[in-house]
Amino acid sequence: MDARATELLATLRNGNVSVDVKTTSLAKLKSEIKQKHVPDAAISPLFESFRLAIASQHYSLSSAGFSALGHLLKRLTLQEQHEAIALQGRATYQLLLERLGDHKERIRSQAAQAFTDFWPAASADVEHHVLGAALIGKNARAKETSMVWLAKMTREYGLLFRIYVPALVTCLEDADGVVRDTAKSTVIELFQSAPPRAISDLKKQLIQNNVRKSIATSILSSLGANIVADSETSSSFQSQSRSDITRPATSFSHRREEVPRSQSVLSMRSHSNADVHNIPKIDAAFKSQSKPTRSGHSSKDPTLSHTASSESLPAPRQDTTDGEGVEPLYINSHREFDDTIREMLPHFEGKESEQNWILREKSIMTLRRLTKGNAPHDYQQYYLAGIKSVLDGILKTANSLRTTLSAAGCYLLQDIARTCGPAIDPMVEILLQSLIKLSAALKKITAQNGNVTVDVIIGNVSYTARILQHIWGACQDKNVQPRQFATGWIKTIIIRQGKHKGSIEHSGGLDLIEKCIKKGLGDPNPGVREGMRGTFWAFYSVWPERADVIMSALEPKSKNLLERDPNNTHRGVASQSFDGSRGSQPHSTKSSLKEAINAQKKARLAASSNVPSRPESAQSSFPDPKSGRPAPRRPTGTSTIRVPTGEKLSQSASLSSAPMRPASRPRRPELVRPATADPYSSRRSAAPTAQSKASSPSDSPQKSKSKLMTTPRSRNPLARPKSRMDNAANVTNDKQRADPAATLAPKMRRRGPSEPDVVSAAARARIAILSPSRTEGDFSVASSQVKIDQKAEEAFQGTPTRGIENGTPLPASPLRSPLKGAFSTPTRNRKSSDGAPPSRIPISPSYSSRRSSEEPMLPRTPLDSRRSRGESDEAASQIPAPVDQSPIIDAINSQSPGILKVYEDPQSPHSKHSIVLGDTVPKTPGSQAKVMPLEELPLNESTTVPNRKHNQLPEHTPLLQPSPILTPSSENSHRRWKKVEGSERRRSLSPRSKDPVKAQDMITRGLARIRTGALDVHGYRKFQNLIKYHESISKDDTKYEDILMALLEALEKPDGDKGAPSGRSLDLKTQVLVTIRLMLVINREAFAAFYPRVMTAIITARKQYELTNHIVSGLEETAEDIVSACNPPQVIDAILDLLETEERSFESYRMVAMGSYILSGLLRRLNNQKLYLSQAELERLGKFANENLRSTQPDVRRAIIDFCPELYDMVQSEDAFWSMVNSSVEDFRPLLTYYIMRRPEKIG
């Protein structure tokens, strides 16, 4: 071979030899190289010969040279002569670079392949020549070929391309169009599977090199990222309307107060303090006020998690607008955030000038976008440190004379306060000093922005005494604006800290608040006085005694204006209280007081004689007008309370010597708002009368307002252990309220040694039947006789009963036989008014399985524990104190001595008679049963329908383990949902609606309005009553399907009217959901066919609402019902079909998170039943998990992490599971392994 190599070299150098001869000689030697060993002496002549051939201008000879060179390099590689390859390559690279820029594509590709063949032996040299010379050279063809080569080497050999990204980005702006297109495709290919950090660096490179927007957008959209040019980050803010500036102070800081909610059932929060929209409730007075929103900035981002102190509360959020929305900016590392802060620091140095104010505005907008993004949550420590470093610049911006720049700074501070909450406590001092001074600015817009910012900060950070000291300083300011704004700030603190009065009282803040209120009520400016009046009544709701002292010290004119203030919802109580205090004055006598009382009595009696007729849909009878307002709360166990009427006390004014104007036309006392029509009726409670021996089970008669009554405070003797679904029982301090949406299956207490084993005859005497005049949601006064229907008797025959006190099994009555699949509803006991100890009642097997751990009979299912969250308003069952025997007892005792039977509501269309526990109230002339809004529910609902409110399940329902869809829910939101759902039961039906023919016509017309979206809230409620009353509707499969499909479409439909108040559309959607749940209850068999469709509608509807909306609890509850009863494979396919086709958006992550938790619950159910899915379904689930593990939303990632352990159990094969779920780009194996192994069953 040595001789043939030398001969070939001579042939190629001879110019007289034809090209064909040279090509033939080269081909022969190539064949020999492929088959034989190449000696060392022949290496140099061969390389020289091939270089001559490649350099030839003849295509055939050049192509043959490339081919022979490739075979030679492969042969030498097999012979492991890498040093010889590297040595000869140094003399070959320049020639290959020239050919890399050849105008023929074939030659360029062969040259690139030659570099590829050299790369294993001399990678550094090859990269230097191709990527360090050709890529940055001037030859466009060489650039194009080198980029293609880079993509190929990265794909096949794992070449690290990071250091060549700047050169690639430079090529994106090359003058040659082909180079630009190749560069774009190369960048997309290289970064297609790159980590987020690399994509972030690419964004910076694109911005630094000023790559045209079309190219950058195309690249980033292909990579799933986005970019916003710096020029677009600065935006001018819309000025606030003049009406917002000139409004009186009473319009500021009137926010509703609500209990902070915990986490949701299906959608867990990212942080413990996330997204609390409202503040805790203080008094029912604030519930009936309409509260105007304040101008400012709205935020929908969750707040920071933090360690809450005893004085701190979750950060509330206001529904305000700043004129323009801000697009969130997401970062991938804390270093990226630090770099951003470092770049904007120079812009805030020195004074504001024409050169730097635009840069400052851009920086503020960038900080707002970062605050809206993931920086405060994922990198909290670095975010707070960065904000602290630029805080001085932010305050400079807020105090700028440029209105736009000042507004931007204020909006940023509001965003920070809402997002971080108590985490910014160390900065509050300096912020309040600057912003209170800003609120005194001459520019109304600037002053208003300062006011709103101070209010937002106060409403979101932890309370300290220094905050009140700053407000006290504002109350003493010489400018009117800070004094006027201070009224709203004080009210915010009172409302927010109302449930935690100790933090204010123990720090001396109460004295400061009193000083502020006194100074405000006596301020020379009428606007300040008007604003402070509203603050005074908020103060009155929390500290009524201290407020009485302040009010008694006012002048008569000021006191009169204060009592007539619109914010005064305690007018009756306050007027009477102060009238009583005036009664001790010398000019007030007992005779005048008696005359006033007698005149009021006569007026009431005369008015009650001519009571106008009322429509049945409102209320069939009028309640006593004395129950119009609740009695005020007192801290002692028994309190003396004046019961007010709803009318204005014209005679009360005569008790004072002050001259009074003639009163306006008085309200008719008999037209008190009925309980069924009062939207706030569910929030009011009436204190039971202790002296009454026989009273209604829901309320007791009250004395006239002229007399004093003593109301003992009843306590809850038996507390149910908290489930993980609820964190606190919804029981007021005054009395226990019955939640109309849920009937508790209470934990029975142990029998004392002196208590009997059976219900005494006197206790059994307190049984009443439902009055025919009442609707199926209420109790009423009992008649004196009971007729027990034979059918109702047979329905309960043979049901095993337990001892009344000790819960031991008793022999079944021969007249009773078990009902298959039916569950009797547990009754409720109430504590008697005279304090008699409670007695037990018979309970069903399903009820006994949920008794306390001290009396175990059946194992409590995990599903039972998760069902208990709506039952926190109920106390342990008790029987009232005994009264005289009645014929009712004889009827009961004749059937089964020692056993208390409970039947269904006689007014219900599904039953004949009903016997319930209650007090017998003897009717006297001139008195009637009062219909109070908070009353007991009927004890027995349909026994053929499993009732989630009683923790009952069908016998065939498997026991489920706690599922991720049952994570702790928001107490406040769930309570509101329960109130909404339960309130739909307290409605009567008109005679026209009871006619089946007319009802069918109304159903048809209502269905048409549902489809067009024209049905209002009251229409939905009437529609629900029609469905509940007429069984024929639920039994007609066609009609049932039409109604259900229309309701599901209405539930999925997004809110189209953006200009309307959000509460109206939310109320409509709530009624739609209540109607769907009603369809589920009345016909579960027909509803079961639509489980997949209903589940997809629920997930689609979840997309439209924040986690804090109470409708979310209803959606989650409905999903739980379906999970426990459906065919899992069908529902899984429906959910995956929905989520796989859903377009990714900012709101769609809510659907994905909820769907993931539902899938987790379905898989858990299958795993517990030892049922497995097909391979195709498992692959779909694995693909779903793999795609969403890389989601940018923390809620989605958390849901998928909870979903993966259930999928792991379902797949069974560990290798198959990791091949489905794990990603080649990012290894999730350690994270998922941790969560799989930390489960209780694995640890145990």
Swiss-Prot record:
* Residue stretches of biased makeup (Polar residues): 261-271, 287-312, 574-591, 607-622
Q: Compositional bias (Low complexity) at which positions? A: 232-243, 652-663, 690-703, 837-850
A Gene Ontology cellular-component term: cytoplasmic microtubule
Q: HEAT repeat ranges?
A: 87-124, 159-196, 1038-1075, 1126-1163
Q: Which Gene3D superfamilies match?
A: Leucine-rich Repeat Variant
Enumerate the SMART domains for this protein.
TOG
Any one GO BP annotation for this protein: cell division
Q: Where in the cell is it found?
A: Cytoplasm, Cytoskeleton; Nucleus; Cytoplasm, Cytoskeleton, Spindle
Q: Which InterPro entries does this UniProt record tie to the protein? A: ARM-like (IPR011989), ARM-type_fold (IPR016024), CLASP_N_dom (IPR024395), TOG (IPR034085)
User: What quaternary structure, including any partners, is listed in this protein's UniProt entry?
Assistant: Interacts with microtubules.
What's this chain's function?
Answer: Microtubule binding protein that promotes the stabilization of dynamic microtubules. Required for mitotic spindle formation.
- Name the family: Belongs to the CLASP family.
The record's GO molecular-function terms, alphabetically, read: microtubule binding
Skewed-composition ranges (Basic and acidic residues): 863-872, 979-998
Q: Where is this region: Disordered?
A: 232-326, 561-758, 795-998
Organism whose genome encodes this protein: Coccidioides immitis (strain RS)
Protein's name according to its UniProt entry: Protein STU1
Which residue windows are coiled coil?
Answer: none
> Which superkingdom heads the taxonomic lineage of this protein's source?
Eukaryota
* Keyword list, A-Z: Cell cycle, Cell division, Cytoplasm, Cytoskeleton, Microtubule, Mitosis, Nucleus, Repeat
